[in-house]
């Protein structure tokens, strides 16, 4: 039966914050079916593709997405009907040209992405392949090392912590399932530690981590390391630390305003702040350490810490190949965060990952703070052998859904699932040089495939 698109239908559903988002169904002539739900961010980069919302305060406080849904059910459906779902590049190119804007503001990135992902899922169903294997069909796959956001702050929580994410990285294990077990044990132990130290853990943040008021940002790291030890693990051997300060959120008038510590820091002082932490704690990754518009500062940060830790650009690059190219040219950062809805199509996401890999940058596949039960990013992380994933803490079903999907994939792959551990992080230190070369090549074939080779 034909793999041509027969029907495209969108609806409005709710995300993990109770806000409307877009869900799309695609049916092929063969009867194959694909469905995808689109996530949404809280702290968003100024150069992200546009998420189209209606703005009518009488409906969902202005957050409804009926216009984006209408765009899928009319303009986009008419444009892609009859196209071959196995030609992902053509599907995405058709929608990009139909939109006609630089940031997908006319149809909405949330409308376009929903169709892009649902079409890919339908194509995988047509070929009767798991989604990750449809994207890349090879013998061995890298399972991603998870960055687990166990203490939430910033825009993700209603507390006094300036920095947005304090994450544990269980990189000292041989399998993903062992790493996940460690993460859950540390997460539950952390609750006991926080309570014993007199902090409230009555609720969790958007990504499932605890959100206590703390005396300083550093207090979050200290609490986490205490929990790691009490859970029976060794910091720097079994568990490492990753940070996402989301510093654009506290960058005001050229200064970094750490209100919880009553500090106003220059770019140079902020870099020194991180450098002191890197020397003191087992930190392997810092995401958005400086503001997205502070490119001169990013250059200094990379020169000072780029050979010691992974420096991830999220708001800095917004999964955009053209912006990433500028960063590579200027020697800024050494890693990119991959968020599907920042760019709006699967094809452009692959292009960004290909460019990053060819430049020696690592790729971290990521969720958004407003998530759904959709597990596409788990398959994407495995398919591209990115080696790293951010999908929240060890609570909230919208986060756990991705971890459970990774467990299923590892089980299915058996000995062909490789957990890279600390080798997933590309950086040099004075004590040891660890080189991991990633080459990501986007190939044209019957299905859009990403081929990833990892050499040690």
Swiss-Prot record:
It comes from the Bacteria. GO terms for biological process: glycolytic process. Its main location: cytoplasm. Its cofactor is Mg(2+). NCBIfam families: eno. (2R)-2-phosphoglycerate binds at residues 164, 339, 368-369, 390. Pathway: Carbohydrate degradation; glycolysis; pyruvate from D-glyceraldehyde 3-phosphate: step 4/5. Its EC number is 4.2.1.11. The keyword Cytoplasm applies. The active site is at 207 (proton donor), 339 (proton acceptor). Signal peptide: none annotated. It comes from Francisella tularensis subsp. holarctica (strain OSU18). Binds a second Mg(2+) ion via substrate during catalysis. GO terms for molecular function: magnesium ion binding; phosphopyruvate hydratase activity. The gene is eno. HAMAP family: Enolase. Component of the RNA degradosome, a multiprotein complex involved in RNA processing and mRNA degradation. This is Enolase. InterPro entries: Enolase, Enolase-like_C_sf, Enolase-like_N, Enolase_C, Enolase_CS, Enolase_N. Mg(2+) binds at residues 244, 287, 314. The keyword Secreted applies. Gene3D superfamilies: Enolase-like C-terminal domain, Enolase-like, N-terminal domain.
């Amino acid at each position: 039966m034909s793999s041509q698109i027969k029907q495209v239908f969108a609806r409005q559903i709710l995300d993990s914050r109770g806000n409307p988002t877009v869900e799309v169904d695609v049916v092929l002539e063969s009867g194959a079916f694909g469905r995808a739900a689109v996530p949404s961010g809280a702290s968003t980069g100024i150069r992200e593709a546009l998420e189209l919302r209606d703005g009518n305060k009488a409906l969902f406080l202005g957050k409804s997405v009926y216009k984006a849904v209408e765009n899928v059910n009319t303009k986009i459906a008419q444009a892609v009907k009859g196209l071959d779902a196995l030609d992902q590049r053509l599907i995405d190119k058709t929608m990009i040209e139909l939109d006609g804007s630089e940031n997908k503001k006319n149809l909405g990135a949330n409308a376009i992405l929903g169709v892009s992902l649902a079409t890919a899922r339908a194509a995988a169903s047509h070929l009767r392949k798991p989604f990750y294997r449809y994207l890349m069909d090879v013998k061995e796959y890298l399972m991603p090392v998870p960055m687990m956001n166990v203490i939430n702050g910033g825009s993700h929580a209603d507390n006094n912590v300036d920095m947005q994410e304090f994450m544990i990285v269980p990189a000292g294990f041989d399998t993903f399932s062992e790493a996940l077990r460690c993460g859950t044990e540390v997460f539950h132990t952390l609750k006991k530690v926080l309570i014993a130290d007199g902090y409230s853990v009555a609720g969790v943040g958007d990504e499932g981590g605890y959100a206590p008021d703390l005396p300083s940002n550093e207090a979050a790291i200290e609490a986490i390391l205490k929990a790691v030890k009490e859970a029976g693990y060794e910091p720097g051997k079994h568990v490492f630390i990753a940070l996402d300060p989301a510093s654009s959120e506290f960058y005001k008038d050229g200064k970094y305003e750490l209100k919880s510590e009553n500090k106003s820091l220059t770019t140079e002082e902020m870099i020194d702040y991180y450098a002191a932490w890197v020397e003191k704690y087992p930190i392997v990754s810092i995401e958005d350490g400086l503001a997205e518009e502070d490119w001169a500062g990013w250059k200094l940060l990379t020169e000072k810490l780029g050979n010691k830790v992974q420096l991830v650009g999220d708001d800095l690059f917004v999964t955009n190949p053209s912006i990433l190219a500028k960063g590579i040219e200027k020697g800024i950062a050494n890693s990119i965060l991959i968020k599907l809805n920042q760019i709006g199509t699967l094809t452009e996401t692959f292009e960004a990952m290909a460019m990053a890999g060819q430049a020696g940058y690592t790729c971290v596949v990521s969720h958004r703070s407003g998530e759904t039960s959709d597990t596409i990013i788990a398959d994407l992380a495995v398919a591209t052998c990115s080696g790293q994933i951010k999908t929240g803490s060890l609570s909230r079903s919208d986060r756990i859904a991705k971890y459970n999907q990774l467990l299923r994939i590892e089980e299915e792959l058996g000995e062909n699932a490789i957990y890279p551990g600390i080798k997933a992080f590309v950086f040099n230190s004075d004590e040891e040089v660890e080189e991991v070369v990633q080459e990501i090549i986007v190939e044209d074939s019957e299905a859009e495939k990403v081929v990833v080779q990892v050499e040690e």
